[in-house]
């Protein structure tokens, strides 16, 4: 009888762990239910200036290869620039005003960056999340046009169709107010958000 009870407890614990692992959203994301498809885990908001600065801090502290290992510690006092994530401050000044006001713009979307820099951000974020949270391995990446279409179809409340910001897609187009615009034809500020793909 004791043996059956112990086996029952073990099974309940294992099931609780499995359910908990599946119910946990990857850090920074919201789960979106898509009809007849697996759930999509998407950033609730576009990547902010403070998110970007944190990734830049890590990249300034050590090489990208070492990020997400015990060899890398984030020390943000480094003044040397790393071109992989450095932003064009002129774009910030045009959009947000003087750089001295960065405390006021921390939560606003990051702008003035290239698609290569967006991809670097996604890789760094993936490494850090996988290092800090071992429950599930995730890969962060830009959303595709299909992802945005599914979010629109699901009427996802965090997708702002009136935003003045365009969002870069993995396809190289800009999602703007419910439409996809070729990058060369879009003249507004461009930002991005990530989706988390569970491995």
Predicted regions and their residues:
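Short hydrophobic-aromatic micro-motifs
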Residues: 38-43, 166-168
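Active-site microenvironments of metalloenzymes and redox enzymes
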Residues: 40-152
């Amino acid at each position: 009888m004791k043996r059956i009870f112990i086996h029952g407890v073990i099974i309940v614990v294992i099931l609780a762990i499995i359910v908990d692992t599946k119910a946990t959203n990857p850090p920074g994301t919201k789960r979106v239910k898509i009809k007849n498809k697996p759930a999509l885990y998407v950033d609730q908001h576009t990547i902010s200036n403070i998110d970007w600065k944190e990734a830049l801090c890590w990249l300034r502290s050590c090489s990208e290869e070492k990020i997400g290992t015990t060899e890398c510690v984030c020390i943000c006092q480094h003044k040397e620039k790393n071109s992989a994530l450095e932003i064009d401050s002129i774009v910030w000044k045009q959009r947000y005003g003087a750089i001295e006001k960065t405390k006021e713009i921390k939560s606003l979307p990051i702008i003035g960056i290239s698609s290569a820099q967006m991809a670097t951000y996604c890789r760094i974020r993936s490494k850090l999340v996988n290092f800090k949270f071992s429950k599930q391995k995730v890969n962060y990446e830009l959303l595709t046009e299909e992802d945005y279409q599914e979010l629109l179809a699901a009427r996802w409340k965090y997708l702002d169709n009136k935003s003045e910001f365009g969002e870069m897609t993995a396809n190289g187009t800009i999602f703007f107010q419910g439409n996809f615009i070729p990058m060369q034809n879009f003249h507004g500020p461009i930002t991005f958000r990530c989706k988390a793909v569970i491995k």
